[in-house]
Structures are given as C-alpha cells and as structure tokens.
Amino acid sequence: MISISHYRLFYKVKLAKLTTKEKDNAINEVRILASINHENIAGYKEAFFEQGSSSLCIVMEYADGGDLQTKINQHKKTMQYMKEEYIWSIFYQMVSGLFALHKKKIVHRDIKCANVFLTKKGTVKLGDLNVSKIAKAGVMQTQTGTPYYASPEVWKD
C-alpha cells in the first residue's frame, strides 16, 4: 500500500507475504536509508512495524515530479526531445547521489530510470535501495537488480 502526503511518501511492506531474502532486503533498505543524508538520495524519515497487518512501514521524502522513466515515456509519446541542459542536470545529480553512496561504500545495484525520482523544482532523488549493499572488500559476487539493465559481462548462459 502506498499513501502520499504533500511532503512524504508512506508505504507498507507486508512481511508475511515475503521470502526471507525479501524481508532482509526491506530491512536493509531502511538501514541504508537511515545512514545517508544527501539531497540526491530519497530522504528517509522513519520506519516502524505495524502489528495488526504485520507490515514494515517506511516514511520517505516524496518526489512530486514522478520518476525519470515516466518522464521519458511522456516525451516519447509527444515526440519531443528533452533539452540537453536538462539531461546534463539529471546526469550530474545522479552522479552526485551515487558519489555520496559510494563514499559510504554503499552500492546501489539497481540503477534504472524507474528508480530515479524527480521533484518539480528539478532535484533528482535516487531511490529504491532495497537491493543495495555495503561493500566489505573486493568485488561483489552476487548478481541482482533488473536483468534488462545488466551489463553483457554479467549475463551467463
């Protein structure tokens, strides 16, 4: 369930219906969000457990401009190009958010347009950190994220 107020996004994760790995991912997202405060990362406000529905409830900053995938689809539908300055602004802010994550050794692992949120004022917010991981040492061995966005070298026959 998702509920939106003017400044915050509230969503429930029904834990009873999730696998152990999915539960771990939900809790991991809360931990990571709570550890970072950056203007280009979707802001975490609070999380709590709701006994009645056995749900993890997460309150997040609301990006009132939707996501980048929707914005791209709207431009395609109307056959309009996005202005180059706008594209560079989005790119710069995405890199700024990723840099903030990487400084804390957090790897997003699911970067795609649907996980890049926008405000009406033009601020970019990276979100959906549920498969993110804190890098311990060396190269991560697990493959995760959205398969169609995976680089060719991670595809296996």
Which residues make up each language-model segment?
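AlphaC helix of the protein kinase catalytic domain
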Residues: 69-81
